[in-house]
C-alpha cells in the first residue's frame, strides 16, 4: 500500500489547534501523541516552537508521533535558531551562534523572538538542552515518494554543502 502524507506546518506552540487538526484528519489519541490513520503519516514542516501558549505540549505530541512512526518532522528556522541560541560561537567568545548574551540590538531582538519558548522550557535547563538536542536530530529536508519536503526553500548548493559535511541524512 502506498503511504499518503498529511503535511502540517508552523504550529508555533498551539497545542489545542494541533490536537483539533489531528482529530479532524482522523488521527486517534495514543499515549502522549496521536496514531495516524491506516495508510497515512503526518509530516511536520518545523516551526513547532515560539509564540504559542503550549510549546512543550506541541513538542511532546510531535516527538511521540515521530517516535511511534505516525509522523516525520523536519527542522524549521525556529528550531534552528534554538540550537544556535544555546551553541557557543568559538569565533565570538562569550556569545552564541544566535547572539543573545550581549546588550546589543541584535541580541535583544533574538531574545525577544525566543522569550516564550525560554519561559516554557526554563532557559538553560536540562529540558531546554534536551529539546535542542532533539532538534539537532531533525533533518532539514525529506525525500518522500519522489517529492522533497523542506521548510523554507531548496538550494542545491546548500544541500550539497550539508551532505559534504557528513550530514547525509539532513540532520545537524
Locate predicted features.
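N-terminal active-site segment of His-dependent metallophosphoesterases
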Residues: 1-61
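Active-site neighborhood of divalent metal-dependent phosphoester bond hydrolases
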Residues: 52-59, 64-172
